[in-house]
Amino acid sequence: MNKTAEDLLDSLKCASKDLSSALTSVTIKFNCIFISTIVLISYCFILLAIQALLRHNIFSNSTRLILIVCLLNSVVHQTTMMETRVRQIYRSFLFASDPCKLLYRSSDCVVDLYFFFLTGYFSTYSVFSLTSDRLVSHYKSKFYHTHQYFIAISLLVIQLLLTLVSFYIAFYGVSLAGYVSVCIQYPKAAVQYGTINTVRTMVMVCCLIVTGFTYYLSVKSEKQIQKISYSPGERYSAYENITTSQSVCIFIILQLSCVMLTSIGMNLLLMMGEAMSEGTFTTIALFLPGITYANLCLPLVIYFKTKLTIRNRKFRIAVMTSMYGDAGEHIARLKKSWE
């Protein structure tokens, strides 16, 4: 960006009357309460999900490690989101009558941008790690079960590299000139930001297709193993593959839905262009933080899937143990059938 363009952006220090009214409105204050509530609920379920993974784990060790890292990453992302929203509301109270102090200079938001977008990209690319984990589990079963932590760490490193590359393409060398309504808004000069969002969406769609196919293969394989194998270890491994693949499918669908909500919503807002005021655009956009919603979905899937699986296991055990009564009755029945 040339110096003239930077100077032009820096000159737009004061919020317009329409934007100023929006940033100090009741709707924006409600948005802060709403997003903060989402974040606080996600904290509770993240704690419950981590406890479930550590105490009542139904996933493989590789999948569990990936999920725990993703949960910890989501804590940072959610905290950044809530901190910026609370700070923006505080600013709207403090400078309600001074529109020239309502906005943030992009250069003052560097730390927030780093935390928000890096953790956001990391959350998105978790679907790649989980999908790859399922593929290795299905096609290289023996290697998978003997090298689970190596596989998980390798996939997390790749996930981190994808995150850093995406952040580099979107923001490296981008001028931080200009002003933004909230500190997590990307700089106006970040022209590659939309391209990276498109790539992220395509990655999630591909991962959903691959994971769905892997889930189908896992179900098919589990049915075959139930017919021909009496090994408890082999049967449990097949059941674990189904449970994990199903959970990953659910998570990717929810993640994709949340991100598409933001992507489609923002694209529609941009298409409307001049037909929509800046204040209305900002108000609607603040209700569309897809990754924040996705970071609530992840612990919900883990926690409730764990509870459901444990309940189903107890039910099956109860059916099996009550089918023939106690051991004495079963032996007596066998003796009678042998006479």
Curated annotation (Swiss-Prot):
Supply the PANTHER family for this chain.
G-PROTEIN COUPLED RECEPTORS FAMILY 1 PROFILE DOMAIN-CONTAINING PROTEIN-RELATED (PTHR31582:SF2), SERPENTINE RECEPTOR, CLASS A (ALPHA)-RELATED-RELATED (PTHR31582)
Protein name stated in the entry: Serpentine receptor class alpha-22
Q: Which family does it belong to?
A: Belongs to the nematode receptor-like protein sra family.
Membrane topology designation: Multi-pass membrane protein
Annotated Pfam families: 7TM_GPCR_Sra
Coiled-coil regions in this chain? none
Alphabetically, which GO biological process terms does the record hold? sensory perception of chemical stimulus
TM segment ranges: 33-53, 110-130, 150-170, 199-219, 250-270, 284-304
MF GO annotations: G protein-coupled receptor activity
Q: Which UniProt keywords apply?
A: Membrane, Transmembrane, Transmembrane helix
What gene is this protein translated from?
sra-22
Q: What InterPro entries does its record include? A: 7TM_GPCR_serpentine_rcpt_Sra
- CC per GO annotation: membrane
Where in the cell does this protein reside? Membrane
